[in-house]
Regions:
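N-terminal positive-inside, membrane-proximal cytosolic segments immediately preceding the first
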Residues: 1-25
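Juxtamembrane interface at the cytosolic side of transmembrane helices
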Residues: 7, 21, 137-176
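Histidine (H) residue identity feature
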Residues: 10-13, 41, 129, 155, ...
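Cytosol/matrix-facing amphipathic helices and coiled-coil assembly/linker segments
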Residues: 12, 37-126
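Transmembrane alpha-helical segments and their cytosolic interface motifs
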Residues: 20-28, 119-152
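Aromatic-enriched hydrophobic runs in primary sequence
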Residues: 23, 31, 47, 81-83, ...
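Hydrophobic membrane-insertion alpha-helices, especially the h-region
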Residues: 25-38
Length: 176
């Protein structure tokens, strides 16, 4: 094939209206893919951070439970010991036990809230990642539409992109 024939063939392909439409569609899908991918990564990060915070709260809860247990033991020991000083110490340790029980309940509640936040972020991340997959498939099918010059492939790509955007948009419906 001569250089002139090759240039004419490229010019013919460049003027193909389907290729232009598919190319524009690919650009739009790529922009949507970027938005969905970044959103998915943000949700995954949020999920992991919330889970780590919940884990920290549970560790704090265990530390408070240990202190409560030690104060309870100390109170029992002081109650068994005769004397005014021992009675005062026993009362002090009983107050500590009450304080640690109350703090433990608050910490436990906070840990459960963080676990719930993590679960919600995880659900959102999964939907965004599936949306990302459908958008990636749409780009591949757009490429096939350009190569095969078939409108059916272009329409399939648009449907795949619609599914991807739709799945991604459902993150706004996840409340718990």
């Amino acid at each position: 094939m001569s250089v002139n024939e090759e240039l004419q063939e490229h010019a013919h392909h460049a003027s193909d209206p389907l290729s232009k439409k598919v190319g524009a569609t690919m650009a739009i899908i790529a922009a949507l893919l970027a938005i969905v991918a970044v959103s998915g990564h943000i949700m995954t990060t949020e999920e992991l951070l919330s889970q780590q915070k919940a884990s920290d709260q549970w560790s704090y809860y265990q530390a408070k439970s240990s202190r409560r247990y030690l104060s309870d033991v100390a109170s029992d020991l002081m109650s068994a010991t005769a004397g005014e000083t021992a009675a005062k110490l026993a009362e002090k340790y009983k107050k500590n036990v009450e304080k640690y029980v109350k703090e433990g309940e608050e910490i436990q509640e906070k840990a459960k809230e963080l676990e719930a936040e993590s679960a919600i972020a995880g659900k959102k991340a999964v939907r965004l990642h599936f949306g990302e997959v459908f958008l990636e498939i749409a780009i591949v099918v757009c490429s096939l539409a350009i190569l095969t010059k078939r409108k059916l492939a272009w329409h399939a790509a648009i449907i795949s992109a619609g599914v991807g955007v739709g799945l991604s948009a459902t993150v706004f419906t996840i409340l718990h």
